[in-house]
């Protein structure tokens, strides 16, 4: 049971046998906590359960939670590789009680697991309790039989946990393992507690109070338990190691990296191998959970981790991208426990390979500048922060890499001056933005939103309504009126017009009132939820307070609805065909077309596109009801509703479901086949979409693909046009539609054969006496000052073939110069000049070809003294170019 996978299973199975629900790890991107960059503890997914906001069908749970600590307050990045127990990625084993058992049972369960199931010697274990937690102190004596000397009271925050400034909180109790006096360090609470002898392997949190805003505490009516045990630490103890990087999992990853680089796992570069092993886990799991490298937010933290590992790969002498080649080893070690690794393996490998390929140039340039700027520094000196910022800002060289590179030399970085330079740049950016006309125009909407409040949106239920003009805006300022012929922005108290958001374009339509008619050309959302109608007054004068009839262009809205619903179906179909790593990165929902951007690192094959289209159309043909529910955002996410990464949602969200629950891949909560958080407008039944036709697929950014499609009559017209085009082509080929593919294949093969024959004929013609210069002999060979010059002009021969012909010409002449000009159908010319070996000291092919290039309108040429090439746009002067070569030879 000493392997990492065995230990994980033993922990979960032990608590399952004791009435706990085994709950899968939540993603590294927190679903219900916008304050967290990454999931960093086992209790994160249960936060709302502990606070009473959410109810679960169980009162006891156990998990092995994926965690990342590499950004914000919890940031272990700089220490990774240099200490025994710091990691960017780790697993947190835990058991939880939601108002069920409390201290006595928690201590009993933990003690039995570590001593009976794991078999740790009791005399190697000590416990800590909060300084005034007499109850826990007594329980450790009673249940574990620990003497007073091995129960240590600890004051301060280390042994008292709280969720925030207010809310659930309580004392902690920790279990420590004693590695023995061969390892330096003292027990917890002692002056030398930071040594490695005593290692915390489990923390039990007793949530028994609620902290109030005034700082006072009340007893919770139902106290709860939250525990956390780092799997890597537990494994080290059970495997007889005092260093986490010596456990079986890390040994496998480190050995694989060492095999690929030739590094000694126990040599002077072992820290670099450890960095690579640790960072491989963090990057792979983050990518599997939908995070991609970028220059902001979670993507930037991922990029920093990746680049730090890549820098250490470079230190190990890796000449080619390394990280992606290690993913298979990680999947072998952890893929059974975390199937998402296996599903996302192609995406992980391709993302790592591309990122490392791009970063190598940045790394080489940055390290070169860093070496130059720090050459005069010695141990203990500080590297200039402004220069560090220039490396970051101009060359894309992250600060932590600068620090890491200088660390080995004992040189620090002046963080204060780095921060000052960063703030100065931000100030310049803000000044530039605030001085723009766009910024001045946009500022009008915030005070209007404060004054008028949110616009009430009626468009989910109707496309015709009545409303009153709340405000008019023209040229960035409030206006008293808009007259006939004038354009501006109209804010209404309520509207059926959808404001552009979530990828869906804004509505258009007509506003009419007493002698007034306004054509709305777009609707936008400003300052959050202020709907702004952009349009032109066609008749009358529009003034604030005027009552209007509001009518959305219903045909256009209907097409938009179909495209938006089709986007949802394509999203789910993409996931089924390509994998669970598919995550939305953007979309456009317009009346005539749709596009959907998503995470994927390689082109989609024609077969995959057809399967995606077929799956989506199968749901259309079901003609099932499209249901919309209003739900609490946390409930919606817990129910499996998909959300757009980075999108901000309110406390209550609309959940759009479509497709029967019996379909493959349907949500387990029975809400539907496709379930998404969405504020857009949708069809009532999937059959209203009519037809989905995928028209294209392309790349839009690194690791992001785009799929484009049509629906309804646009899709029908597209299909009809394609069929008619195919029929026309079949008619031209004198065949049927069914026989057209083999007919085209046959014609293409015949064409290739004819092209080969034509090429050979041209070559023979060229060497047998193609068109010569005006002063050449019949065979294109003449005497220039006693030197033979073969000068010929030919058509339709490629440059590579010209070189071969020039070599043949040199052999024919024995001694001499060969000049061949080939003209193409667009009038351009290519020229090759060859000089036999005995003449290269007298004539340079490079010099001669450049003389010809000038005549052809080109810009020089290049090559070697015995063979050079050039070109030019004016092929009509081929003969003159050959004469220029003869003149340069002295003829």
Curated annotation (Swiss-Prot):
Cofactor: binding comment: Binds 1 zinc ion per subunit.
EC number: 6.1.1.7
Cofactor: Zn(2+)
Residues reported in the UniProt entry to bind Zn(2+): 564, 568, 678, 682
One GO term (biological process): alanyl-tRNA aminoacylation
Catalytic activity: tRNA(Ala) + L-alanine + ATP = L-alanyl-tRNA(Ala) + AMP + diphosphate
InterPro entries per UniProt: aa-tRNA-synth_II/BPL/LPL, Ala-tRNA-lgiase_IIc, Ala-tRNA-ligase_IIc_anticod-bd, Ala-tRNA-synth_IIc_core, Ala-tRNA-synth_IIc_N, Ala-tRNA_ligase, Ala_tRNA_ligase_euk/bac, DHHA1_dom
Main location: cytoplasm
Keyword annotations from UniProtKB, A to Z: Aminoacyl-tRNA synthetase, ATP-binding, Cytoplasm, Ligase, Metal-binding, Nucleotide-binding, Protein biosynthesis, RNA-binding, tRNA-binding, Zinc
Function recorded in the entry: Catalyzes the attachment of alanine to tRNA(Ala) in a two-step reaction: alanine is first activated by ATP to form Ala-AMP and then transferred to the acceptor end of tRNA(Ala). Also edits incorrectly charged Ser-tRNA(Ala) and Gly-tRNA(Ala) via its editing domain.
Entry text on domains: Consists of three domains; the N-terminal catalytic domain, the editing domain and the C-terminal C-Ala domain. The editing domain removes incorrectly charged amino acids, while the C-Ala domain, along with tRNA(Ala), serves as a bridge to cooperatively bring together the editing and aminoacylation centers thus stimulating deacylation of misacylated tRNAs.
Family affiliation: Belongs to the class-II aminoacyl-tRNA synthetase family.
Protein name, per record: Alanine--tRNA ligase
Organism (species): Nitrobacter hamburgensis (strain DSM 10229 / NCIMB 13809 / X14)
Gene name of the encoded protein: alaS
């Amino acid at each position: 049971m000493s392997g990492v996978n065995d230990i994980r299973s033993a922990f979960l199975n032990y608590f399952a046998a004791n009435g706990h629900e085994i709950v899968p790890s939540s993603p590294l991107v927190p679903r219900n906590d916008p304050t967290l960059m990454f999931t960093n503890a086992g209790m994160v997914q249960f936060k709302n359960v502990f606070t009473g906001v959410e109810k679960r069908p169980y009162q006891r749970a156990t998990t092995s939670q994926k965690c990342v600590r590499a950004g914000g307050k919890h940031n272990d990045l700089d220490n990774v590789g240099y200490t025994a127990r710091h990691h960017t990625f780790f697993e947190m084993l835990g058991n939880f009680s939601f108002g069920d058992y409390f201290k006595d049972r928690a201590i009993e369960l933990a003690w039995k697991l570590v001593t009976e199931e794991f078999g740790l010697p009791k005399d190697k274990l000590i416990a800590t309790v909060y300084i005034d937690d007499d109850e826990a102190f007594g329980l450790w004596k009673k249940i574990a039989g620990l003497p007073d000397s091995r129960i240590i009271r600890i004051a301060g925050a280390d042994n008292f946990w709280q969720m925030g400034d207010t809310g659930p909180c309580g004392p902690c109790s920790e279990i420590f393992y004693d590695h023995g006096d061969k390892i330096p360090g003292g027990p917890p609470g002692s002056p030398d507690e930071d040594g490695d002898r005593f290692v915390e392997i489990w923390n039990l949190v007793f949530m028994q109070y609620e902290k109030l805003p005034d700082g006072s505490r009340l007893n919770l009516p139902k106290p709860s338990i939250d525990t956390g045990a780092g799997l890597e630490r537990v494994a080290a103890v059970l495997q007889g190691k005092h260093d986490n990087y010596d456990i079986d999992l890390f040994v496998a990853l480190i050995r694989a990296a060492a095999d690929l680089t030739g590094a000694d796992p126990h040599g002077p570069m072992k820290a670099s191998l450890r960095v690579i092993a640790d960072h491989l886990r963090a990057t792979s799991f983050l990518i599997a959970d939908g995070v991609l490298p970028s220059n902001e937010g979670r993507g930037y933290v991922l990029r920093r981790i990746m680049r730090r590992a890549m820098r250490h790969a470079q230190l190990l002498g890796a000449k080619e991208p390394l990280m992606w080649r290690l993913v298979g080893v990680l999947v072998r070690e952890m893929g059974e426990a975390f199937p998402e690794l296996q599903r996302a393996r192609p995406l992980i490998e391709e993302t790592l390979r591309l990122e490392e390929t791009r970063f190598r140039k940045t790394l080489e340039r940055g390290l070169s500048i860093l070496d130059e700027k720090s050459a005069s520094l010695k141990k203990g000196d500080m590297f200039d922060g402004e220069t560090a910022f220039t490396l970051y800002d101009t060359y894309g060289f992250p600060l932590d890499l600068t620090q890491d590179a200088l660390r080995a030399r004992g040189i620090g970085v002046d963080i204060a001056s780095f921060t000052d330079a960063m703030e100065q740049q931000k100030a310049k950016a803000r000044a530039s933005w605030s001085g723009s006309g766009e910024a001045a125009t946009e500022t009008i909407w915030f005070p209007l939103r404060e004054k008028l409040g949110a616009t009430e949106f009626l468009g989910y239920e109707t496309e015709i309504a009545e409303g009153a003009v709340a405000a008019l805006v023209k040229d960035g300022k409030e206006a008293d009126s808009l007259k006939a012929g004038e354009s501006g922005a109209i804010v209404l108290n309520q509207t059926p017009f959808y404001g552009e958001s979530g990828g869906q374009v804004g509505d258009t339509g007509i506003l009419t009132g007493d002698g007034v008619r306004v054509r709305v050309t777009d609707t936008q959302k400003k300052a959050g939820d202020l709907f702004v109608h952009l349009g032109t007054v066609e008749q009358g004068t529009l003034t604030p307070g005027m009552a209007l009839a509001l009518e959305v262009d219903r045909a256009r809205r209907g097409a938009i609805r179909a495209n938006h619903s089709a986007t949802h179906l394509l999203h789910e179909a993409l996931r089924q065909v390509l994998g669970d790593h598919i995550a939305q990165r953007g979309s456009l929902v317009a009346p005539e077309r749709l596009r959907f951007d998503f995470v994927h690192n390689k082109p989609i094959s024609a077969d995959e596109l057809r399967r995606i289209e077929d799956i989506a159309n199968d749901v259309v043909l079901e003609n099932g009801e499209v249901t919309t529910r209003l739900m609490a955002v946390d409930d919606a996410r817990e129910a499996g509703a998909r959300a757009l990464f980075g999108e901000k949602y309110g406390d209550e969200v609309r959940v759009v479901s479509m497709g029967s629950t019996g379909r493959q891949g349907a949500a387990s909560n029975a809400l539907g086949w496709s379930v998404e958080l969405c504020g857009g407008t949708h069809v009532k039944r999937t059959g209203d979409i009519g037809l989905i036709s995928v028209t294209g697929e392309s790349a839009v950014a690194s690791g992001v693909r785009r799929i484009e499609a049509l629906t309804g009559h646009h899709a029908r017209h597209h299909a009809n046009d394609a069929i008619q085009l195919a029929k026309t082509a079949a008619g031209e080929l004198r065949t049927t539609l069914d026989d057209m593919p083999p007919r085209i294949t046959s014609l293409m093969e015949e064409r290739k054969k004819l092209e080969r024959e034509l090429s050979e004929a041209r070559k023979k013609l060229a060497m047998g006496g193609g068109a010569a210069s005006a002063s050449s002999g019949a065979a294109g060979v003449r005497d220039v000052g006693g030197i033979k010059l073969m000068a010929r002009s030919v058509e339709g021969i490629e440059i590579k073939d010209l070189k071969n012909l020039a070599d043949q010409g040199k052999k024919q002449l024995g001694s001499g110069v060969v000049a061949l000009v080939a003209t193409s159908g667009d009038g351009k010319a290519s020229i090759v000049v060859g000089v036999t070996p005995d003449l290269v000291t007298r004539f340079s092919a490079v010099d001669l070809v450049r003389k010809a290039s000038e005549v052809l309108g080109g810009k020089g040429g290049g090559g070697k003294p015995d063979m050079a090439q050039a070109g030019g746009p004016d092929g009509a002067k081929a003969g003159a170019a050959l004469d220029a070569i003869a003149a340069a030879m002295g003829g």
